[in-house]
Swiss-Prot record:
The gene is fbp. This is Fructose-1,6-bisphosphatase class 1. Keywords: Carbohydrate metabolism, Cytoplasm, Hydrolase, Magnesium, Metal-binding. CDD domains: FBPase. PANTHER family: FRUCTOSE-1,6-BISPHOSPHATASE-RELATED (PTHR11556), SEDOHEPTULOSE-1,7-BISPHOSPHATASE, CHLOROPLASTIC (PTHR11556:SF35). Mg(2+) 2 binds at residues 116, 119, 282. It catalyses: beta-D-fructose 1,6-bisphosphate + H2O = beta-D-fructose 6-phosphate + phosphate. Mg(2+) 1 binds at residues 94, 116, 118. GO terms for molecular function: fructose 1,6-bisphosphate 1-phosphatase activity; magnesium ion binding. The keyword Hydrolase applies. Homotetramer. Substrate binds at residues 119-122, 210, 276. Its cofactor is Mg(2+). Pathway: Carbohydrate biosynthesis; gluconeogenesis.
Amino acid sequence: MSIARRTTLSKFLIEQQRETNNLPADLRLLIEVVARACKAISYNVSKGALGDALGTAGSENVQGEVQKKLDILSNEILLDANEWGGNLAAMASEEMETFFPIPANYPRGEYLLVFDPLDGSSNIDVNVSIGTIFSVLRCPDGKQATEESFLQPGTEQVAAGYAVYGPQTVFVLTTGNGVNCFTLDREVGSWVLTQSNMQIPADTREYAINASNARHWYDPVKRYVDELNAGKDGPRGDNFNMRWIASMVADVHRILNRGGIFMYPADKRTPDRPGKLRLMYEANPMSFIVEQAGGAATTGTQRIMEVQPTGLHQRVPVFLGSKNEVERVTGYHDEAK
């Protein structure tokens, strides 16, 4: 592809604004700012030990997880990049206990930005793909946000995306009109459109789950995975392969490209906690992307994007990816009720 014929993220968004007339200018600018912040995060991730950003920071986030230095740095990059542009009323991050209102000395906008600044950060020190996940909502209270302003079901998202910092840095985006992937051209610093209208195959022979937790799973998940593992001699009559990167962005990106099902179920170790992944920061944005690509996403009992949030850091079980497989494991949950 010649440089002159490349479609950059900026050009793509402007063309979308002209063609569909459903991409407001402030939302377009917000997406571009988030994408620029992801470039900065990518740069810091790629420096590794040379940037003195590996290892833990000696602190814990609101979930009680030990924070990596790059967790904190990535969070600061996103806050600093977005607080002054006039597009946002407030932000919320997986790394912060409460939401972040736009300071009074900056103009405020009508949108809310929700993000996981560095998903899969347990993989930082071993150089495995990690990423950033984000979601955009409208502020129902105009420009004066409260915590309640964020507690909207995923169906209210106006944009969602993620960046993967791997062999290439990619930025995957939906604004409710399909899913597109942009690759970072490091030489010129531009996001270049490399995949349009991405679609997840309805059927798959790959699944992603942390099998070390098998002894803790509830019966519907055990049944489903046992059938997959039985291969050609089992009830499915086919062989399936397991893939598990322990980085949601990397696992979902693989599924978006070649199909599969990603599962992070609730289990018996914490019966009072429904799952591990965060609804607002991980499950909702990824579900929006997956559904826009023709896939499905449920908690096992409910469409994820229809869950009514009750708190910023609410957790849910997650089953997402190829539609027929998600519907099958969801059906097993229905049968077990």
